[in-house]
């Protein structure tokens, strides 16, 4: 008669007890299933799109891209943020459930980049609108750098306490700037307001009669030189 053979698992596994805290269990579940909301407005987002391929395979980190902010707990901003897009970004962030995280990817997102030079329509840093957890510099950052930023965010999540994060978000709110616009008269009739037209100071301060008298007294050879 053949003897009864027990499975290998029953023969080798001993009784064991796993102890943990609810906070550690919550952190482990969140860092293992980060669902990012992809907010790409410029060329940096192309580098993040390459992570979806088989070469980098960002699915191993539990990243599942979502198209709705109510189903995401991570927003990854990549590219230039303009003044017109700023309210939409803040609205998307406010619609995300707690706890939520932000990764600022690229120089244009962190500081405005080259597009913020003498520009009135570019936000010089996304941290002026929403709180940022990880800054990822570069123009554009490589996919390996994006993976490193996600790894650092996972380490941050594993060490945090949920109550402390909610308290800090309620106290340390990000600041916003109120822009005031001057409403002018309608210009559809062709009558432009002279106050809105730019006049160089070196010609506007000189009377027209004096300017033309000086121009007629100077020869063409002197004007060229």
UniProtKB/Swiss-Prot annotation:
<comment type="function">
    <text>NDH shuttles electrons from NAD(P)H:plastoquinone, via FMN and iron-sulfur (Fe-S) centers, to quinones in the photosynthetic chain and possibly in a chloroplast respiratory chain. The immediate electron acceptor for the enzyme in this species is believed to be plastoquinone. Couples the redox reaction to proton translocation, and thus conserves the redox energy in a proton gradient.</text>
</comment>
<keyword id="KW-0408">Iron</keyword>
<feature type="binding site">
    <location>
        <position position="139"/>
    </location>
    <ligand>
        <name>[4Fe-4S] cluster</name>
    </ligand>
</feature>
<dbReference type="GO" id="GO:0019684">
    <property type="term" value="P:photosynthesis, light reaction"/>
</dbReference>
<keyword id="KW-0934">Plastid</keyword>
<dbReference type="GO" id="GO:0051539">
    <property type="term" value="F:4 iron, 4 sulfur cluster binding"/>
</dbReference>
<dbReference type="InterPro" id="IPR006138">
    <property type="entry name" value="NADH_UQ_OxRdtase_20Kd_su"/>
</dbReference>
<dbReference type="GO" id="GO:0045271">
    <property type="term" value="C:respiratory chain complex I"/>
</dbReference>
<keyword id="KW-0479">Metal-binding</keyword>
<keyword id="KW-1278">Translocase</keyword>
<keyword id="KW-0472">Membrane</keyword>
<feature type="binding site">
    <location>
        <position position="108"/>
    </location>
    <ligand>
        <name>[4Fe-4S] cluster</name>
    </ligand>
</feature>
<dbReference type="GO" id="GO:0005506">
    <property type="term" value="F:iron ion binding"/>
</dbReference>
<keyword id="KW-0004">4Fe-4S</keyword>
<keyword id="KW-0874">Quinone</keyword>
<dbReference type="GO" id="GO:0048038">
    <property type="term" value="F:quinone binding"/>
</dbReference>
<dbReference type="GO" id="GO:0009535">
    <property type="term" value="C:chloroplast thylakoid membrane"/>
</dbReference>
<dbReference type="InterPro" id="IPR006137">
    <property type="entry name" value="NADH_UbQ_OxRdtase-like_20kDa"/>
</dbReference>
<keyword id="KW-0150">Chloroplast</keyword>
<feature type="binding site">
    <location>
        <position position="43"/>
    </location>
    <ligand>
        <name>[4Fe-4S] cluster</name>
    </ligand>
</feature>
<dbReference type="GO" id="GO:0009060">
    <property type="term" value="P:aerobic respiration"/>
</dbReference>
<dbReference type="Pfam" id="PF01058">
    <property type="entry name" value="Oxidored_q6"/>
</dbReference>
<keyword id="KW-0411">Iron-sulfur</keyword>
<comment type="subunit">
    <text>NDH is composed of at least 16 different subunits, 5 of which are encoded in the nucleus.</text>
</comment>
<dbReference type="GO" id="GO:0015990">
    <property type="term" value="P:electron transport coupled proton transport"/>
</dbReference>
<keyword id="KW-0520">NAD</keyword>
<dbReference type="GO" id="GO:0008137">
    <property type="term" value="F:NADH dehydrogenase (ubiquinone) activity"/>
</dbReference>
<keyword id="KW-0793">Thylakoid</keyword>
<keyword id="KW-0618">Plastoquinone</keyword>
<feature type="binding site">
    <location>
        <position position="44"/>
    </location>
    <ligand>
        <name>[4Fe-4S] cluster</name>
    </ligand>
</feature>
<comment type="similarity">
    <text>Belongs to the complex I 20 kDa subunit family.</text>
</comment>
<protein>
    <recommendedName>
        <fullName>NAD(P)H-quinone oxidoreductase subunit K, chloroplastic</fullName>
        <ecNumber>7.1.1.-</ecNumber>
    </recommendedName>
</protein>
<keyword id="KW-0813">Transport</keyword>
<keyword id="KW-0521">NADP</keyword>
